[in-house]
Amino acid sequence: LIDWNAFQIFNVEEVPENTTWSLSTDLLSERGVAFGTLYEYQRDDMFDLPGLSRGQLDAWGLQDHGTDNLGRDRRNVTPERDFRGRIFWQHRQLLRDGIQLSAEVGLISDRNFMEQFYERVWDQEKDPMTGVALKKITDNRVWDLAANIRVNDFFTQTDWLPKLDHHWLGESIFADRATWHEHTSVGFGTLKPATAPLDVAEQAKFDLLAGEEQKYSGIRAASRQEIDFPMQWGNVKVVPYLLGEVAYWGDDISHQSVTRTYGQVGIRSSLPMSRTDANIKSKLFNVSGLAHKVNWMLDAYWADASENMDRFPRYDALDDDAQEHYRRRFFFDTFGGIAGQNIASKWDERMFAYRANMQGNVSSPVTEIADDAMTFRLATEQRWQTKRGIAGKQHVVDWMVLNAEILLFPDADNNEGQHTGMFDYDYRWHVGDRFT
């Protein structure tokens, strides 16, 4: 791989300030010659619009003469196109009156290109989108007007033409006795399912997920509100709350219009505790004093929805494209699925989100997740903190972290016939500044 300074190659005498432009060439012995370019910029105005802007254009491609090696039983996959590559552009600009303009282009040649040539980006970074958005943040209020289209037909994505979101979070009402949160959205969405692979072996393990089997198109509007009543009972913080939503879909999985009402009432509480002992020291474990901080938490709620969750298409994605790509194979590899069937509800990712109370979040990224429930969530957050650094300049660090939670379901039907489930834990030991 060789990178070239494009400004020098093309003899550009007046290089725009705060910009870099490179060209790249690469020879892949078993695949072919590749070419690419990367242009990065940060300017005070762009497109004749005043305001600080920054962004990047990254393009790379090759005439591919090889095959893809994507893991077990995918060692020799024939690419769907001979010329393969991607064009990726991101732009963000601050306009007048605090309005933020964002634009993005994410064009990919075929379904396996990113997994083969950009595996870290494929696994870890956001999905490539093609669209534009305007956003304005005023104190605790945000409105967001966006439009995007699907340009890669091998991914399941929703075109929004357009979609308007409004958030109003943490607003104090009733003379500071309550707190109000709101999220309202309306848009015209077209859910476009992914096309099947051309490779015969890939096609044999491809089946669309439940809720994305067809093309769905229509208006979706929803408004979700929550009112909290925070109280202090001695050392315990208690927050009774009421949450409600009214949502409308112009096209459900049966191509009918439907209105759903949803209500949730519950109580959240937390009890913080701590103990500090400056005499605990260890050179071996790099400990100089120890503070143990614990927060015990409870979230108990009852919820009721007028419509079942499985009535709605996946207008909002739960997972990134990479995870959806895997889930379609997961159905065959792990569960021996048959094309046309769906994974059991016990393993359906929508049910995991529902049991984890995604619907209890006013700003939930997935409107479709909501159903009847009665759940108790018991959780603890624990920190063991110490001081590190040279004398006189010590700083506090989390030496160990242990978080754990368990969900209890009085009605076992809400949890696949089990009263307990979804036990999660997260333990981290920060041995040193460079190793965890």
Residue locations for each model-derived region?
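Outer-membrane beta-barrel initiation region
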Residues: 1-51, 118-137, 365-398, 410-421
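Asp/Glu-centered strand-loop micro-motifs enriched in Gly/Pro and often flanked by an aromatic residue
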Residues: 1-12, 22-24, 29, 76-77, ...
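Surface-exposed extracellular loop regions of Gram-negative outer-membrane beta-barrel proteins
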Residues: 11-22, 27-75, 105-109, 127-146, ...
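A short acidic (Asp/Glu
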Residues: 32-37, 67-69, 112-115, 156-158, ...
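Outer-membrane beta-barrel translocator/channel fold
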Residues: 58-94, 102-120, 183-217, 257-261
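Recognizes the extracellular SEMA beta-propeller fold with strongest preference
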Residues: 83-112, 128-149, 154-162, 166, ...
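Short linear interaction motifs
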Residues: 115-116, 124, 147-148, 281, ...
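Outer-membrane beta-barrel translocator/pore domains, especially the C-terminal barrels
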Residues: 135, 139-140, 159, 163-436
